[in-house]
Each structure stands twice: as C-alpha cells, then as structure tokens.
Amino acid sequence: MDSAPLLQIDGLGKRFGAKVAVDGLSFSVAAGEIVGLLGPNGAGKSTTFLALAGFLRPEAGTISWNGVALGHDRGRTIALIPETPEVYPLLTVWEHLVFVAKSNALAPGWEKKAGELLERLGLGGERDTLGRALSKGMRQKTLIAATLLADTPVLLLDEPMIGLDPQGQRELREMLFDLRTTGKAIVISTHMIEQAQQLCDRIVILKDGRFVAAGTFDELRERVGREDAEELFLELTRA
C-alpha cells in the first residue's frame, strides 16, 4: 500500500499470570487495507484484539493511530466486533443507531446517513427488528453500521466467518471489500488460511502469541515454497 500506516502496533505484550498470551507483536494496517491475523487456536489472536480495543491492558508495547500513541480509552478510534456479536435484545436495529448518534453527539442530519448505511449493508428491511430476533450475520451488520455511523476508523472482526452459512460468508466478504473503499483500516482474525487468502491484502501469522511471518499470500507462498494454502500454513506454524 502506498498510504502511510493508519494503525501501528509495536512490541505488544500480554501475560495472564505465568502464561504469555502475546509476546512482542508488531504489525501495521494502512487505510483501505484488510489485514488478517492468522493462527491456530491459542495463538493469541483474540487477546491481541481485546488489547487493541482497550478491553485488556497490555504489559508492553504501543498502539498508535496516525503517528499518535493511543491511551487506554480508544473506543472512538478502534471498534471490535467479537466472534459472538452482542446487540441489545430489546432495541430495534434503528434504535441501536439512535443510541450511537446520541452517545456520540452526532450533528443533526445523521438520520440520512444511518438510513443509507442500513440499505448499503442489507439491513433496510430489518430497521424495526428487535436485536433478539437477529441472526449472527444481522448482528454483525448492525454493529458495523454503528461503527460506520460513529465514523470509527479502525474495525476489528474476531473470527467473523464462524457460524455463518455460505451465503452469509459471501455477503460478509462483499461487505468488507466495500468497506475497504471507504478508507477504513480493517483487521480480521481467523484460523483458516483459505479465508485469509480470499479476504486479506496481507496476512500476519501468529503462533503461541509470537509473530511468525507477514506478507501477502503470494509473498508467503514464495518464501516457503508451498502452493497449497493449508500446507503453507502448516509449514509456517510448525514447531
């Protein structure tokens, strides 16, 4: 990417007692780029996301946005959509956006943008649907609409494909490609290299909380000398 990094992570570290969950992790994400955080279960992906979003305090490292180090309260800069997206069960899709508008003191006229976002994300017909009646895919979209309405520049999605049927996965891919054109910095976590290959401009591979490799899929393939995606992943994460 030609643009300067929007999000920069340097030396991120997090422990739980004697267990090292993330150890000296560094990577960057540019505006309009999708980066995949790839690794087996227990690699430290979710811990990294929780630390980036401010839900966990790392013991080491810095997180910067546009060259400025972020403090612990960074919810207006980095939004996390967890593996199991949670919405308010008794609020409608539209009421979620009303809540965002009020809590962020958005300027008058936000309703037009909110309506356009719902249509863009395929939620136009779900405007009055209660949160408890939404599928996982619809909950994801509701949270994404909220982050876009608040104009949060960095979007983290933890294992976003899990639990989605093939149509839902296809819709999510199309939505992420569309979001990339808006200049958002997007990071997804996954343990499946095929998904990372399909979705991501670059891939950052972790194992046991440590950085293993990073690059485009083609760069990683050339480095390892493996054509098959699964063989490539196994080779890079081999003990």
Feature locations, PLM:
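Conserved ABC transporter NBD signature motif
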Residues: G61-R76
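Conserved ABC ATPase "signature" region
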Residues: V98, K102-A105, G109-E126
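Conserved ABC ATPase signature
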Residues: L130-G137
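Catalytic Walker B motif of ABC-type/P-loop ATPase nucleotide-binding domains
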Residues: L155-E159
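Helical segment within the ABC ATPase nucleotide-binding domain
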Residues: Q169-T182
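ABC ATPase "signature
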Residues: A214-G215
